[in-house]
Amino acid sequence: LVIRRQRQMCIRDRPYCSLPELEACMEVWSFMEMIHSRSYTYVIKNVYPDPSEVFDKILSDNRILDRAATVTESYDEFINEAHQYDTGNWWKDGWRDHVSGKLERKEIKRKLYRAVANVNILEGIRFYVSFACSFAFGELKMMEGSAKIISLIARDENQHLAITQNIINNWRKG
């Protein structure tokens, strides 16, 4: 669920990216998330005799949905705020320097910062905690194929962490 939302994030925030390098990076990130989603599907299909039960439960389990919401809520807030700005009048020449227009842009930036910080936490902490069990199976010589897949996903998530940290550090510099 979070993987699918991350792919959507990469696609939805592209209009708000002003650097071609970062836009290309997001494109690659989105592709990686698609591969991760298919990899998780492969692992589940090889562990459960009836994987449809697992897939169906994911979208109805409140604990899973609540956990995903903690990650995606700030991103949705940013997208909604940015969309409101785009469809309003604040960006037009006459309103650009108006106090309300400046406050609106500041709020969009605050929500974007919060969204990227949440993705940073997801990539840097939450994914690694969820990988621990798979790594343990691999060390015990059990489910080694799945552990290898998860280790490749962890490598990608480490790249995503570096990207979000770089973005945050560049914003901090001004």
Predicted regions and their residues:
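Single conserved hydrophobic/aromatic residue that forms the stacking wall/gate
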Residues: L1-I11
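Long, hydrophobic, well-ordered secondary-structure blocks that form the structural core
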Residues: R12-R96
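Inter-helical turn/loop segments and adjacent helix faces that build the functional surface
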Residues: D13-A24, I44-F55, K102-R114, A132-L152, ...
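Internal amphipathic alpha-helical segments of the cytochrome P450 catalytic fold
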Residues: L22-E23, S37, F127, M143-A147, ...
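Generic structural signal for well-ordered, non-transmembrane alpha-helical segments
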Residues: S30-R38, N120-I125, S151-A162
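All-alpha helical catalytic cores of prenyl diphosphate-utilizing isoprenoid enzymes
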Residues: K57-L140, N158
